[in-house]
Amino acid sequence: IPDGVASDVDRAVSAARTAFDAWSQTPVEERQKYLVRLNEALQARSAEIAETIAGEVGMPITWSTMIQAGLPAGNMATFATLLDSFEFEEEIGNSLVVKEPVGVVGAITPWNYPLHQIICKVGGALAAGCTIVLKPSEIAPLNAFILAEIIHDVGLPAGVFNLVSGNGPTVGAAISAHPGIDMVSFTGSSRAGKQVAASAADSIKRVALELGGKSANIVLDDADFAAVIPKGVFACFLNSGQTCTAHTRMLVPNSRYDEAVEIAAAAVAATPVDDPTKEGMHLGPLISQAQWDRVQAYIQKGIDEG
């Protein structure tokens, strides 16, 4: 996998700026046809995408097929459908509101749902008439190269989509600070998001940040614990817990604490854990040693805190 540098970002931005004038003026109907073809191509290569991401991220193949390959194609189809009714011009009183493409969009995406996150950014930008410079996660980049092949095969004009692989401190930083980029869309940690926002501020870019967090699962006293506790465990363990909305903190009434622990422990014991390429598995490996160490630290912290 190429380890990009700032000069690679310069070339990608130059290509995106060159392509922007023509792409932004391309009729909506033509842009929509490209999105439809992209959706069809994503579906045609869904098995390959699912296997690739199962290998990169560790999500079991059954879930990878449904989520990691299914969501990107579905989202691309949604963007294509939106162009049927989206109003790029709207009359309000005696004023005309015109919605124009913002320009060159820098997209920096995470590793947990890699292609899904890429399509959420790239699909919308293409539909709006923007050109893109994408930096996928360096931990799970292969799916982005499949998308680049698909984009090439459907004939998207040169320079409309540009892929620069590499790490965040080098490629991500170059994208967020580049004067030729008009907007940055970032999904990842709060720490990195602060750096992206600070870098983008110098050139007054538009910035969209989706940052990490924790999700409380509140179970009330009158709930059916036998039904909801296992579902909470499932929601916590999906994608090995590597989900921004994973229900990692189950809060139950103190009077039913022991009951909840017993049901949760039984649900965990019944969770199939093995090679993610095997059918029927629910829990695969974590994506990296660093992530494994982080999870172990949280487990130990929980034990230490009682």
Predicted segments, located by residue:
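Glycine-rich phosphate-binding segment of PLP-dependent enzymes
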Residues: D10-Q25, E48-M59, L82-L83
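Long amphipathic alpha-helix in the N-terminal Rossmann-like dinucleotide-binding domain
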Residues: S14, V36-A47, I61-F86
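Rossmann-like NAD(P) dinucleotide-binding subdomain of oxidoreductase/dehydrogenase enzymes
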Residues: F88-A227
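Generic non-transmembrane alpha-helical segments
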Residues: R37-E48, I146, I150-L156, I229-P230, ...
